């Protein structure tokens, strides 16, 4: 008996551990700054007014388009979702069996224990009903900015960017991560691009500390609202 209780306790601990969200950690290698693959050679000073390596096209701008360049992404995300679901199942069954004879004969239906004669008639009726309703609403708003680096430039000119920002506060840390693809034409003259122009965007806003813990339900509450709850 004690062994069975230990098995159930261990299984419950494993299930409850799966309900705990992982804590984000800084210095993720995937979001680390990407440096240029080939550093530019140092130009020799020949004493002339014109120095090779410092030239700039008259009609070009300072937009980021090389690996390792810096781009600022302005976050302006708003999402809302609502879902309603309802189900109702009802079933009624009834069966009546009436017999006056059995194999061509009428059996003796006298009750030897008293209280009236017995009967060959039988009946069954049953009702079953199940009803469920659910409703879920969610809304999120994320505004701000984050500066990332160019990780890769594809042959068609699409720029892959990614980066993260950690803010250390009195009661914990806040994390903003973003990764995605942008077009060079969407980069403004001040080297910024809105997050709504980022394709295949992966935006993460999370944190650690007392504020992050206060916004999360307890482990037992997460179990009751999880698919593991049988009712």
UniProtKB/Swiss-Prot annotation:
The lineage of its organism: Bacteria, Pseudomonadati, Pseudomonadota, Gammaproteobacteria, Pseudomonadales. GO terms for biological process: bacterial-type flagellum-dependent cell motility. Residues 1-18 form the signal peptide. GO terms for cellular component: bacterial-type flagellum basal body, distal rod, L ring; cell outer membrane. A lipid is attached at residue 19 (S-diacylglycerol cysteine). It is found in: Cell outer membrane; Bacterial flagellum basal body. Belongs to the FlgH family. The basal body constitutes a major portion of the flagellar organelle and consists of four rings (L,P,S, and M) mounted on a central rod. It comes from Pseudomonas putida (strain ATCC 700007 / DSM 6899 / JCM 31910 / BCRC 17059 / LMG 24140 / F1). It is a lipid-anchor. The keyword Signal applies. Pfam families: FlgH (PF02107). The gene is flgH. Assembles around the rod to form the L-ring and probably protects the motor/basal body from shearing forces during rotation. Transmembrane segments: none annotated. Keywords: Bacterial flagellum, Cell outer membrane, Lipoprotein, Membrane, Palmitate, Signal. InterPro entries: Flag_Lring. This is Flagellar L-ring protein. A lipid is attached at residue 19 (N-palmitoyl cysteine). GO terms for molecular function: cytoskeletal motor activity.
